[in-house]
Each structure stands twice: as structure tokens, then as C-alpha cells.
């Protein structure tokens, strides 16, 4: 069985509840808010070859893929060049520096 993508409708409007942070070279999930996540109430069937865009704060979930067919997912994180991006962020890696789409 290939689990269906589920999202919490309107969940992106709530507070940031958790974030990933590098601590001593290891990734940890940090709790920021005790407010429970909203229920994932919307099933999003995604056909092969589709593109799905999710807001960074949208709670989403997918059950484990137990089928014999792989379910590939590629993630692109877009960050405004004018924002301060903390060194402790889990995406910041000296071995793989972030690249800009714009030549300054």
C-alpha cells in the first residue's frame, strides 16, 4: 500500500510548533509551542509526475509506503535572500552550501 498524502486544512495559519535544529552536528526537533497540531483532514491524491507545493508551516503526513513501487519525493526549500538564515538551521551544511538563483 502506498500511503496517501494528508494535510491539515488551514494548518499553515497557526503558530510554528516545531523546528529542526543542528545541535553538536546532529539534527534535533525543537518544540516551540504546546498547541496541538490540527488533524490531517484532507487527503490529497497525487498522480505520478505531479508537482505538489506546500507552505512551510502546513502540517502534512503520509503513511509508510509498503508497496513494491518506490515513491520518490524531491524537496526544494526557497529562502528569501534578504532574510537572516541562522547557521543552526538543519539545511545549513558547510559541505553543501546554499546556492542563490540570483547572481548578486
Regions inferred by a protein language model and the residue ranges of each:
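Double-stranded beta-helix
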Residues: 1-58
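Non-heme Fe(II)/2-oxoglutarate
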Residues: 20, 51-53, 57-104
